[in-house]
From Swiss-Prot:
Top-rank EC class of the record's enzyme: isomerase
One GO BP: D-ribose metabolic process
MF annotations from Gene Ontology: ribose-5-phosphate isomerase activity
Active-site residue list: 103
Keyword flag Chloroplast: no
SUPFAM superfamilies reported in the protein's UniProt record: D-ribose-5-phosphate isomerase (RpiA), lid domain, NagB/RpiA/CoA transferase-like
GO cellular component: cytosol
Binding site for substrate: 28-31, 81-84, 94-97, 121
Protein name: Ribose-5-phosphate isomerase A
Pfam families in UniProt: Rib_5-P_isom_A (PF06026)
Pathways per UniProt: Carbohydrate degradation; pentose phosphate pathway; D-ribose 5-phosphate from D-ribulose 5-phosphate (non-oxidative stage): step 1/1
Protein species of origin: Edwardsiella ictaluri (strain 93-146)
Subunit structure: Homodimer.
């Protein structure tokens, strides 16, 4: 199976976690897009979705799935999204698609986080994939200096503005031995909106696309 076929397999496998009559939290990226396509086959059975990005909102609407503002919703049954890396403790690096802040907010509201990935995203130690940090534009240089103090090598993602109008610093050369501690430290830097470490609130279920099928992992 190609990587895209693995992504499609896990996107469709996540449908089994969708309960009729609920509002579904939907992530962003190529794997999440396959889930959105699958979700469209159930659109008559669900109330609708809450989206983590403008791109996913457009895809949901194009398929006839009602999209709710998160402020209209008290809680979400599930949130389904991909990841750039996931470790054995179900902690993730996310934000390669620059939607990390809205993804983290929707994940916080959801009762269950279902992470959908192909097997290449599984790692023992997070950090090989550059860690995205969303930053208020005027704080970019200051935050970069603070990230260097934490042992990283931040690189400005030029030409990219988030849906919130902010910039992204991608932090290279990290071996993240204590994900929760680093998440808290980066979030404490003035000017940081959020960091793409999903450690304090990790996934509850991971669906991993492998050559021999979809594996289900839980803690």
């Amino acid at each position: 199976m190609t990587q895209d076929e693995l992504k499609k397999a896990v996107g469709w496998a996540a449908l089994k976690y969708v309960r009729p009559g609920t509002i579904v939290g939907v992530g962003t990226g190529s794997t999440a897009s396959h889930f959105i396509d699958a979700l469209a086959t159930m659109k008559g059975q669900i109330e609708g979705a809450v989206s983590s990005s403008d791109a996913s909102t457009a895809r949901l609407k194009s398929l006839g799935i009602p999209v709710f503002d998160l402020n209209e919703v008290d809680s979400l049954d599930i949130y389904v999204d991909g990841a750039d890396e996931i470790n054995g403790a179900m902690q993730m690096i996310k934000g390669g698609g620059a939607a990390l802040t809205r993804e983290k907010i929707v994940a916080a509201v959801a009762k269950k986080f279902v992470c959908i990935v192909d097997a290449s995203k599984q790692v023992d130690i997070l950090g090989s994939f550059p860690l995205p940090v969303e930053v208020i534009p005027m704080a970019r240089a200051y935050v970069a200096r603070e990230l260097v103090k934490l042992g990283g090598q931040p690189v400005y993602r030029q030409g990219v503005l988030t849906d919130n109008g902010n910039v992204i610093l991608d932090v290279h050369n990290l071996q993240i031995m204590e994900p929760c501690k680093l998440e808290n430290a980066i979030n404490a830097i003035a000017g940081v909106v959020t960091v793409g470490l999903f450690a304090n609130r990790g996934a509850d279920v991971a669906l991993v696309g492998c050559a021999d099928g979809v594996k289900t992992l839980t803690l």
